[in-house]
């Protein structure tokens, strides 16, 4: 615990907490000051000027990061017949129908990171709403995980597709890579994410859309990014 405290304090000294950095400067700094013995994940935390309590101010979607996230996601696909074969050929880790519902319900099995379903299977998948929903695993058309084009969905996920959505405090939390990516690749991933979030701005949103942006590694301090420069 003391080691972590010293490491964190040392990293914190290198961050100007009164400054709003440009994205490339901030992400290079996050990468440079990371000191853990593992390859830390870098996350972006974006506070938006919307009210998630209103249906017309929801912000949700997905974007393929140009350099991926540094993690290979395990994909479970609910499909039957030809679509099940397509999913297997595309590299899905698990493919099935009712038997997977029973496995999840009966064994509390969650050895997967994302769920894709063909539209005709949503009646079956809906039975898992109470267990998949709280874990953020429920397939959704807005994120491209309810589709008949299962091969495309799997390809995008394996290539580094990430989902983004508001939490109850109107903040989006999304990984943009690993510290080993370095500043340039992290910045390119971050830019792709921000472009998608800006395009997803609800028509009902009033005032400043990007309220605050912070990036940080798993064990490191937050570095603030200038939201005005990001929106340009």
From Swiss-Prot:
Which CDD domains does the UniProt record give? Ribosomal_L1
Q: Looking at the keywords, is RNA-binding present?
A: yes
Its GO CC terms are: large ribosomal subunit
Pfam entry (one): Ribosomal_L1
Question: Key word Membrane present in the record?
Answer: no
For this UniProt record, the keywords arranged alphabetically read as follows: Repressor, Ribonucleoprotein, Ribosomal protein, RNA-binding, rRNA-binding, Translation regulation, tRNA-binding
InterPro entries given in the database record = Ribosom_uL1_bac-type, Ribosomal_uL1, Ribosomal_uL1-like, Ribosomal_uL1/biogenesis, Ribosomal_uL1_3-a/b-sand, Ribosomal_uL1_CS
Q: Which GO terms describe its biological process?
A: regulation of translation; translation
GO MF assignments: rRNA binding; structural constituent of ribosome; tRNA binding
Task: List each coiled-coil range.
Answer: none
Q: Which NCBIfam families match?
A: rplA_bact
Q: Which PANTHER family match?
A: 54S RIBOSOMAL PROTEIN L1, MITOCHONDRIAL (PTHR36427), LARGE RIBOSOMAL SUBUNIT PROTEIN UL1M (PTHR36427:SF3)
**What role does this protein play?**
Binds directly to 23S rRNA. The L1 stalk is quite mobile in the ribosome, and is involved in E site tRNA release.
* Quaternary organization: Part of the 50S ribosomal subunit.
What is the name attached to this protein's record? Answer: Large ribosomal subunit protein uL1
Look up and give the organism this protein is from. Clostridioides difficile (strain 630)
